[in-house]
């Protein structure tokens, strides 16, 4: 019954107004109160402030400043092998694997539509049918900037208005087409591994989604699909990003979905649902060049994995009582 009640709240609560309220509060300068809120947040979610460029919580004027805090340059080493794609975000893998024609795995026994995720853009969807996907959830404790898995030339960006359902174990199991219903920003890149989409998905209390080339994409929330295009590389006005370079950020967190063309990449074999991710670590390898099979993400301490799982609502430690 408790889970049924929680799920009902996802439909009943005014998620847009809650999100606006959270965004308003997170942007306010409140002196000692801001520091108190940040300190409580750090303690509750076990945020490792030693990784931040500014480890002193008093140095953040607003909660948003804290939430998008940059990390020290040395804490996320980048795998520089040109045949290896790297993880775009700190977080936990929700699902990953093969796109089955138009179906992407949302949760065990539940799929959603590739074409719906891409706002009905069947031409873009055709690039990724039978390709590969990875869905990464960023928990509240995580670094909330998103980076490039490989070198890329930006070709298209689409803002898709939508719902603001929370992303967690309960909604993934019970809200049909969750990621294709939520607000999102779709970024399409040309890469040496074929076309790649990197999709930033909103959720309840995600105050804004930003990119490095266009700034804040949402808000405002105008309720209409918006589309931008860019020229190929070497042309005036083109946008080129390097592997490991920041491409966007969330103010209050959510989900990143990566789509890769069929036959272009092999996911690292040890990765699975609930694997903890760190920016710059191996995610996939090229299918066209030999890469040593022992390539793996660097092992993480057990307490770091536990803290990440404890903070992630994707990990369901309670028996479902519905």
Swiss-Prot record:
<feature type="active site" description="Charge relay system; for autoendoproteolytic cleavage activity">
    <location>
        <position position="254"/>
    </location>
</feature>
<dbReference type="InterPro" id="IPR003817">
    <property type="entry name" value="PS_Dcarbxylase"/>
</dbReference>
<comment type="pathway">
    <text>Phospholipid metabolism; phosphatidylethanolamine biosynthesis; phosphatidylethanolamine from CDP-diacylglycerol: step 2/2.</text>
</comment>
<feature type="site" description="Cleavage (non-hydrolytic); by autocatalysis">
    <location>
        <begin position="253"/>
        <end position="254"/>
    </location>
</feature>
<keyword id="KW-0444">Lipid biosynthesis</keyword>
<comment type="function">
    <text>Catalyzes the formation of phosphatidylethanolamine (PtdEtn) from phosphatidylserine (PtdSer).</text>
</comment>
<keyword id="KW-0456">Lyase</keyword>
<keyword id="KW-0210">Decarboxylase</keyword>
<dbReference type="GO" id="GO:0004609">
    <property type="term" value="F:phosphatidylserine decarboxylase activity"/>
</dbReference>
<dbReference type="GO" id="GO:0006646">
    <property type="term" value="P:phosphatidylethanolamine biosynthetic process"/>
</dbReference>
<keyword id="KW-0443">Lipid metabolism</keyword>
<feature type="region of interest" description="Disordered">
    <location>
        <begin position="294"/>
        <end position="322"/>
    </location>
</feature>
<feature type="active site" description="Schiff-base intermediate with substrate; via pyruvic acid; for decarboxylase activity">
    <location>
        <position position="254"/>
    </location>
</feature>
<dbReference type="InterPro" id="IPR033178">
    <property type="entry name" value="PSD_type1_pro"/>
</dbReference>
<comment type="subunit">
    <text>Heterodimer of a large membrane-associated beta subunit and a small pyruvoyl-containing alpha subunit.</text>
</comment>
<keyword id="KW-0865">Zymogen</keyword>
<keyword id="KW-1208">Phospholipid metabolism</keyword>
<keyword id="KW-1003">Cell membrane</keyword>
<feature type="compositionally biased region" description="Basic and acidic residues">
    <location>
        <begin position="303"/>
        <end position="322"/>
    </location>
</feature>
<keyword id="KW-0594">Phospholipid biosynthesis</keyword>
<feature type="active site" description="Charge relay system; for autoendoproteolytic cleavage activity">
    <location>
        <position position="90"/>
    </location>
</feature>
<comment type="similarity">
    <text>Belongs to the phosphatidylserine decarboxylase family. PSD-B subfamily. Prokaryotic type I sub-subfamily.</text>
</comment>
<feature type="active site" description="Charge relay system; for autoendoproteolytic cleavage activity">
    <location>
        <position position="147"/>
    </location>
</feature>
<keyword id="KW-0472">Membrane</keyword>
<keyword id="KW-0670">Pyruvate</keyword>
<dbReference type="GO" id="GO:0005886">
    <property type="term" value="C:plasma membrane"/>
</dbReference>
<protein>
    <recommendedName>
        <fullName>Phosphatidylserine decarboxylase proenzyme</fullName>
        <ecNumber>4.1.1.65</ecNumber>
    </recommendedName>
</protein>
<feature type="modified residue" description="Pyruvic acid (Ser); by autocatalysis">
    <location>
        <position position="254"/>
    </location>
</feature>
<dbReference type="Pfam" id="PF02666">
    <property type="entry name" value="PS_Dcarbxylase"/>
</dbReference>
<dbReference type="InterPro" id="IPR033177">
    <property type="entry name" value="PSD-B"/>
</dbReference>
